[in-house]
Amino acid sequence: MKLNILISVLIFQLNLFSDISFTIDETKIIGQISSDKKTQSFLGVPFAEPPIGNLRWKEPIPKKYIESEFLAHKFAPACMQEERIVDWYKGVAIGFGGDPDYISKPDISEDCLYLNIWRPNNTSDSLPVHVFIHGGANKAGWAYEPNYVGDKLASKGIIAITISY
């Protein structure tokens, strides 16, 4: 599918640049460097046009970037869903003696087809890529659930990608 092509292009372009940006369709996608300077992140990068209006319930259409720059510094909303996964995470936190309030309900929207990308900072090496597709049986889940945030993998020399769908 076209998503595979987009991911391949993103990975290729991420490996070419030593700064924290890459270009898609003449739009500069601007990421950020982590506070410990070990990783770069590009959060909430759209891979398809929003599936709303006449695009609802249709096959995704690749994103047509029209901006000169896109700031990829925050997670995009999760797709529409029930709150059961949040309750599950809170139960896990309680089970391990943690604070259940650490887990908060994600923002949700029908406009939810986004990628999050993490990579090591200061390298132009070809790197392995790990793509996470969250679970939830198409009823719950989001690409930045605590167990899907990719900064730890990136600090170990891996490009990590999560997909919202």
Q: What are the residue ranges of the model-derived segments?
A:
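Absolute protein N-terminus
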Residues: 1, 18-19
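Sec-dependent signal peptide recognition
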Residues: 1-9
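Hydrophobic h-region of N-terminal signal peptides that target proteins for export
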Residues: 8-17
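Non-catalytic accessory segments of hydrolases
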Residues: 19-165
